[in-house]
Amino acid sequence: MKKTLLTLLFGCVVTAQAQDIIVMEPSYPPFEMTEEKGEIIGFDVDIANAICKEMNANCTFHSQPFDSLIQSLKQKQFDAAISGMGITEPRKKQVLFSEPYFPSSAAFIAKKDTDFAKVKTIGVQNGTTYQHYLAKEKKEYNVKSYASYQNAILDVQNGRIDAIFGDVPVLAEMARKHEGLDFVGEKINNPNYFGDGLGIATHLKNQVLVDQFNAALKTIKENGEYQKIYDKWMGGK
């Protein structure tokens, strides 16, 4: 895979469109998902495209398991990752983040009419802050980890797990698409685990690119483009 030399592209006057390679885990609707034709779509994709347009950059998207995104950035295999990734202190030691582009909060979904007091086994995506939270703060539960939430949905529907724990908009999309699932228990806001929102991650030494991201994010929030994208993917969530 050809690697973009961002220090050259963004460290001088750009006379042609820069090429950015952005990686994500595309089974996390409404943030990112793969449609029938194989194209990656979603809130994160539209936000990234709007940011890249402001930067006069041509962004391409590649898929990869969530738990390997940070390592790929550290090895400079990709330019950036936007994949519903919370800005947390442990992650900030490994990668550099943009300003938050979305707030972060967590919740549980289960079969409708589930008594949360009887929940014992919880599904969660591997490598996420939600997995870390359950391991440290909810030791009374049995935790089953998944590469993506698709298999977790099947397991909760078939009674192999009692609930799924994750990001509120993602769970809301699951409940919308899968009849019989609904929120249970209380929403959880804990910045010690879930950070100060979701951010775009890059290599630790890529401050120039992060500055470009932040400036473009500020612009799309001010000109109304961010709100249009939010309403498209998050309306009612």
Curated annotation (Swiss-Prot):
Keywords: Amino-acid transport, Periplasm, Signal, Transport
SUPFAM superfamilies from the UniProt entry: Periplasmic binding protein-like II (SSF53850)
CDD domains, per the entry: PBP2_Arg_STM4351
Gene Ontology, cellular component aspect: membrane; periplasmic space
Signal peptide segment: 1-18
Keyword field contains RNA-binding: no
GO biological process, any: amino acid transport
Gene3D superfamilies associated with the record: Periplasmic binding protein-like II
SMART domains hit by this protein: PBPb, PBPe
Matching InterPro entries: Iontro_rcpt_C, SBP_3_CS, Solute-binding_3/MltF_N
A GO MF label: ligand-gated monoatomic ion channel activity
Pfam families documented for this protein: SBP_bac_3
Compartment list: Periplasm
Family: Belongs to the bacterial solute-binding protein 3 family.
PANTHER family given in the database record: ABC TRANSPORTER ARGININE-BINDING PROTEIN 2-RELATED, MEMBRANE-BOUND LYTIC MUREIN TRANSGLYCOSYLASE F
Function summary: Binds arginine; part of the arginine periplasmic transport system.
Protein's name in the database: Arginine-binding periplasmic protein
Encoding gene, per UniProt annotation: lapT
